C-alpha cells in the first residue's frame, strides 16, 4: 500500500514538473515574440567580422550582386525579404537574442556596392571622351614641349597659342590626365604618333624659350649687330642648353624681341618718376568732359558759310551756261568740231586723220586693193594690214537704225563690246568703232534721219 502510494506521488510530481517546464517555455517564447515585435525585426545571427578572400567566378559575381541588392530591399513592414526566406533560428540563438537590449536601432541606409561599381564604370568612359574633341594631337604636343621647357603651367597658358582658347584649369586638367590617366595618355600618344613629320617640326619650332636659353641670349650685347653666324656659333657652343628644334634665325628673332622689351643684360629700364601717375586709356577717357566736345553754334561763321556756298553755286551755273561757247572756240582751233551735214550725208565715220561720209543706205568697210574696191578704205586712216579686205558692212534700215555687220576675221569693237564674225550690232550716235587698233566715231545726221523716219511712218499705214 505504501509502495503504491509512493509511486503515485512520484508520477504526479513528474507530471507537475513537466507541466511547469512547458509553461515556462511557453512564457519564454511569448516574451521573445513580444521583444521581437517591439524591435520590428527578426534578430540577426552573430557572425565573424573577419573577411575570407576567396576567388569568385563570373556567375557568382552576378548572382551575389543580385542577391545583395535584393537583401537590401525591405518590405513595408520593415522585414528583410532575404531573411524571411531563410530557416528559423535555433534555441541557442533565441537565448542569445533574449539577452540583447530592447531599444530599437534605426537602420542606416547604405548604398549597395554593386550599384556604386556600375555608376563608376559608366562614368569612366564619359571622363575619357570628354576632351577628346577639343584637344587635338598638335595641342598635346605643344603642351608637352612647353611644360618640358618652362615647368610652369601658368606660363604655358599665357605663352602657347592652342587651337582652342583653353582656360588655365583646362590646361592643368589635361596635363594631369596625360600624366596619370592611362587611357587618355595612350590615346594621345597614338594620335601624336600619326602626325606628319612636317607638322611635328612646325610644332617644335613654336616651343617656348626656357630661362636658360633666354639667359644665354641676353648675354649678346644690344649695341652690337649680331648676324646669323653669331647665333649659329651660340648653338654650337651650347647644344645642351638649347632646344633641339632651335635655328639661328629663331634665336635672332627672339633676341630682337628681348631687345625690344629691354630684357638684355646691358640694357637698363628707365624708372618712372615717383610723382607722376601713369594713366591708361580708360582713365584718360573718363577725364574728358563730354560737354566740351559738343559743337558750339557760331552764327557769324554759319552766315559766312551760307554766303560762300551761294556764291560757288552761282559760279558753277555761269560756267555751265558758257560751256558751249568755249566748246566752239576749242573745236575751231583743233579742227575737231562737229561736221556740217548736208542733205545727202546720212552719217559720218570720223577718224583721227580722215572723215568718211555715208551717203547711201549701205557701205562696205575694209582694205582696198587693185582687185577689190570698197566704199570706205580704212588704210587711209593708218596701218591696216590686220584689217580684212571686206571687214564689215554698215546698213541703214527703214526705221532709221544703223547696224554694222562683221564679215572679217578679227572682231569689231563697238563701245568696247566685241562683234565677232557673222554677228551684227546696232550703231547709235557717237558710238566708238574700233577695228584693228584704228578708232572711229560714228556720227548720225539727226535731221535727215528724222525725215526718213517720218516718211517711213507715213508709208507703213498704207
Curated annotation (Swiss-Prot):
Gene for this chain: Mcrs1
GO terms (BP aspect): chromatin remodeling; DNA recombination; DNA repair; positive regulation of DNA repair; positive regulation of DNA-templated transcription; positive regulation of protein localization to nucleolus; positive regulation of telomere maintenance in response to DNA damage; regulation of cell cycle
Name this protein carries in UniProt: Microspherule protein 1
Matches recorded under InterPro entries: FHA_dom, MCRS1, MCRS_N, SMAD_FHA_dom_sf
SMART domains: FHA
The entry's keywords: Acetylation, Centromere, Chromatin regulator, Chromosome, Coiled coil, Cytoplasm, Cytoskeleton, DNA damage, DNA recombination, DNA repair, Kinetochore, Lysosome, Nucleus, Phosphoprotein, Transcription, Transcription regulation, Ubl conjugation
Domain FHA intervals: 363-419
Modified residues (N6-acetyllysine): 123, 130
Phenotype upon gene inactivation: Embryos exhibit normal morphology at the blastocyst stage but do not survive to the gastrulation stage. Apoptosis and global H4 acetylation are normal and the trophoblast and primitive endoderm are properly specified but the epiblast lineage exhibits a severe reduction in cell number with mutants failing to form a typical inner cell mass colony.
Keyword Transcription regulation found: yes
Function description: Modulates the transcription repressor activity of DAXX by recruiting it to the nucleolus. As part of the NSL complex it may be involved in acetylation of nucleosomal histone H4 on several lysine residues. Putative regulatory component of the chromatin remodeling INO80 complex which is involved in transcriptional regulation, DNA replication and probably DNA repair. May also be an inhibitor of TERT telomerase activity. Binds to G-quadruplex structures in mRNA. Binds to RNA homomer poly(G) and poly(U).
Keyword Plastid in annotation: no
Subcellular location, principal: nucleus
Domain notes: The N-terminal region is required for nuclear localization while the C-terminal region encompassing the FHA domain is required for centrosomal localization.
Highest taxon of the lineage: Eukaryota
Coiled coil: 301-335
UniProt subunit comment: Component of the chromatin remodeling INO80 complex; specifically part of a complex module associated with the N-terminus of INO80. Component of some MLL1/MLL complex, at least composed of the core components KMT2A/MLL1, ASH2L, HCFC1, WDR5 and RBBP5, as well as the facultative components BACC1, CHD8, E2F6, HSP70, INO80C, KANSL1, LAS1L, MAX, MCRS1, MGA, KAT8/MOF, PELP1, PHF20, PRP31, RING2, RUVB1/TIP49A, RUVB2/TIP49B, SENP3, TAF1, TAF4, TAF6, TAF7, TAF9 and TEX10. Component of the NSL complex at least composed of MOF/KAT8, KANSL1, KANSL2, KANSL3, MCRS1, PHF20, OGT1/OGT, WDR5 and HCFC1.
Biased composition (Pro residues): 103-112
A molecular function (GO) term: poly(G) binding
Amino acid at each position: 500500500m505504501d509502495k503504491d502510494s509512493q509511486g503515485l506521488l512520484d508520477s504526479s510530481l513528474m507530471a507537475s514538473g513537466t507541466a511547469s517546464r512547458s509553461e515556462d517555455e511557453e512564457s519564454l517564447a511569448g516574451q521573445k515574440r513580444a521583444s521581437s515585435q517591439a524591435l520590428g525585426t527578426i534578430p540577426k545571427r552573430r557572425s565573424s567580422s573577419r573577411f575570407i578572400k576567396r576567388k569568385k567566378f563570373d556567375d557568382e559575381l552576378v548572382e551575389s550582386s543580385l542577391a545583395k541588392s535584393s537583401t537590401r530591399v525591405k518590405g513595408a513592414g520593415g522585414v528583410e525579404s532575404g531573411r524571411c526566406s531563410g530557416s528559423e533560428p535555433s534555441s541557442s540563438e533565441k537565448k542569445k537574442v533574449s539577452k540583447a537590449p530592447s531599444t530599437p536601432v534605426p537602420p542606416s541606409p547604405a548604398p549597395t556596392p554593386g550599384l556604386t561599381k556600375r555608376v563608376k564604370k559608366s562614368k569612366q568612359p564619359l571622363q575619357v571622351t570628354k576632351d577628346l574633341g577639343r584637344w587635338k594631337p598638335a595641342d598635346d604636343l605643344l603642351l608637352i614641349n612647353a611644360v618640358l621647357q618652362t615647368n610652369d603651367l601658368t606660363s604655358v597658358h599665357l605663352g602657347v597659342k592652342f587651337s582652342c582658347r583653353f582656360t588655365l584649369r583646362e590646361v592643368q586638367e589635361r596635363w594631369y590626365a596625360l600624366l596619370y590617366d592611362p587611357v587618355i595618355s595612350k590615346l594621345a600618344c597614338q594620335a601624336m604618333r600619326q602626325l606628319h613629320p612636317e607638322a611635328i617640326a612646325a610644332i617644335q619650332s613654336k616651343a617656348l624659350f626656357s630661362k636658360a636659353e633666354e639667359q644665354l641670349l641676353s648675354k649678346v650685347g644690344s649695341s652690337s649687330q649680331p648676324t646669323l653666324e653669331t647665333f649659329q656659333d651660340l648653338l654650337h657652343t651650347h647644344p645642351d642648353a638649347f632646344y633641339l628644334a632651335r635655328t639661328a634665325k629663331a634665336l635672332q628673332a627672339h633676341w630682337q624681341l628681348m631687345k625690344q622689351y629691354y630684357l638684355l643684360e646691358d640694357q637698363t629700364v628707365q624708372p618712372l618718376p615717383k610723382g607722376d601717375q601713369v594713366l591708361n586709356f580708360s582713365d584718360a577717357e573718363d577725364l574728358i568732359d563730354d560737354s566740351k566736345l559738343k559743337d558750339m553754334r557760331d552764327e557769324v561763321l554759319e552766315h559766312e558759310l551760307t554766303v560762300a556756298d551761294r556764291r560757288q553755286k552761282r559760279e558753277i551755273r555761269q560756267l555751265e551756261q558758257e560751256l558751249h561757247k568755249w566748246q566752239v572756240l576749242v573745236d575751231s582751233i583743233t579742227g575737231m568740231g562737229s561736221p556740217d551735214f548736208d542733205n545727202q550725208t546720212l552719217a559720218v565715220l570720223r577718224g583721227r586723220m580722215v572723215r568718211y561720209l555715208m551717203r547711201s543706205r549701205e557701205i562696205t568697210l575694209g582694205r582696198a586693193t587693185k582687185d577689190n574696191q570698197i566704199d570706205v578704205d580704212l588704210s587711209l586712216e593708218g596701218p591696216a594690214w590686220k584689217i580684212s579686205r571686206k571687214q564689215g558692212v554698215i546698213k541703214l534700215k527703214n526705221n532709221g537704225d544703223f547696224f554694222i555687220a562683221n564679215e572679217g576675221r578679227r572682231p569689231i569693237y563697238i563701245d568696247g563690246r566685241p562683234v565677232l564674225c557673222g554677228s551684227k550690232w546696232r550703231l547709235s550716235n557717237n558710238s566708238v568703232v574700233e577695228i584693228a587698233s584704228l578708232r572711229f566715231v560714228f556720227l548720225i545726221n539727226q535731221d535727215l534721219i528724222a525725215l526718213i523716219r517720218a516718211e517711213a511712218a507715213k508709208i507703213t499705214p498704207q
